[in-house]
A protein has these predicted regions:
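Hydrophobic beta-strand anchors of alpha/beta hydrolase catalytic cores
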Residues: 69-70, 104, 171
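Buried hydrophobic packing residues in well-ordered domains
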Residues: 55, 74-77, 88, 119, ...
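Short active-site neighborhood of thiol/selenol oxidoreductases, capturing the structured segment around
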Residues: 60-84, 88
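Thiol/disulfide oxidoreductase modules built on the thioredoxin-like
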Residues: 139-196
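Structural microenvironment flanking redox-active thiols in thiol-disulfide oxidoreductases
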Residues: 83-143
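Sec/Tat-exported extracytoplasmic proteins
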Residues: 67, 92-99, 123, 144-151, ...
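N-terminal targeting signals for export/organelle localization
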Residues: 1-47, 202
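A short beta-strand-turn-helix
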Residues: 48-68, 92
């Protein structure tokens, strides 16, 4: 089986899991967005303007020419986000030099608490090339909408500042042209993620 066939097979399995995830969790992929497709290609991704962990303003155009592996989460996330970023880090390490073609990106869904400084400190535990992105409430909301990420804020009645989030935990693989390639569930293990990336890069 050639690399393209492997990638198509993996994408089919992954997409099925992605759709099942949202069905089980009972929510639209992104409220307010059209749920029907006319082109047969998922409309995921698009323009954004955010701030990285160094304070630099960046847009989607800064990533053109490289693959992107995008994960949405927040630094106060107790388990899913750090475990997902650990899998991302290990998979990229497993790819060796091939991983240089991929830019790993973590976009926060918590614009109020996740400042560039907080992202910078948090991301030191993961891949050295991991780009952390934050922004104003409207900027982060626009990125969430573009990527069709399910996000629901969960308030803490006793301590309002201790709110958390329910959110979709998915790796979004984007092509060199910024186009969406495939969703990869956070439950994917290191070897599976490395294989999916390797097949796409071949």
């Amino acid at each position: 089986m050639n690399a393209r066939s492997i990638l198509l097979a993996l994408c089919g399995l992954i997409l099925g899991g992605w759709l099942a995830y949202f069905a089980v969790n009972g929510g639209d992929m992104a409220p307010g967005l059209p749920q029907t497709q006319t082109s047969g290609k998922a409309q995921v991704g698009g323009p954004f303007t955010l701030t990285d962990q160094t304070g630099k303003r960046v847009t989607e155009k800064d990533f053109l020419g490289r693959y992107m592996l995008v994960f949405f989460g927040f630094t106060s996330c107790p388990d899913i986000c750090p475990s997902g970023l650990q899998v991302m880090t290990a998979a990229l390490d497993k790819l060796g030099a091939k991983a240089d073609a991929v830019t790993p990106v973590f976009i926060t869904i918590d614009s109020a608490r996740d400042t560039p400084e907080k992202l910078s400190a948090y991301l030191k535990s993961f891949h050295p090339r991991l780009v952390g992105l934050t922004g104003s409430e409207s900027e982060v909301a626009a990125a969430i909408k573009a990527y069709r990420v399910y996000v629901q804020k969960v308030p803490d009645e006793k301590t309002p500042s201790n709110y958390t989030f329910d959110h979709a935990a998915i790796f979004y693989l984007m092509g060199k042209d910024g186009a969406f390639i495939a969703p990869i569930p956070h439950t994917t293990d290191v070897d599976e993620l490395a294989r999916a990336l390797s097949a796409s890069l071949s």
